[in-house]
Amino acid sequence: MEAYIVKIAPAAEGEEFALTIEITDEKGLRRENHCIAAQYFRETTLPSHIDAPYAADAEMLSQIRYLSLCTAAIRAGLRLLEFSFNTKKNLRGKLIRKGFPPEAADEAVAFFSENGYIDEAGQAEMLAWELAEKKKYGKNRIKTELFGKGFESEVIRDALE
């Protein structure tokens, strides 16, 4: 198998890099198109642009495919977060149900957590207050509700203080 990256270009207003790879093997020539989040792309050894085909070994090809999958999981996660709040646990489960491997779902959840898209502590506090004030739930009922929504025990404990 021979693989060459034939195109690397910024995409999505610089938030991603688009790559086109030509692969020749016993099946013939085929092209793969991938998008990688800029944050992940900077962690690779790939140049930001090429003037001639750039040889890609099996390890590099595997890395590109994985990072492209993680980028797709981030895009899917953003769409999910646009419509409703999700805990890390719930978002991970939804991404896996959409067909992403657990590793890519974990990577996307870490991205959202590190970049402030998921604030479980703030959401748990707000929900605990709402349940106590509006629905007049007691601590145990609030704890059960928060746990049912996927909040971790430590986050629940802090929200109830």
Name each model-derived stretch:
Residues 1-161:
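An alpha-helical, amphipathic repeat domain used for nucleic-acid recognition
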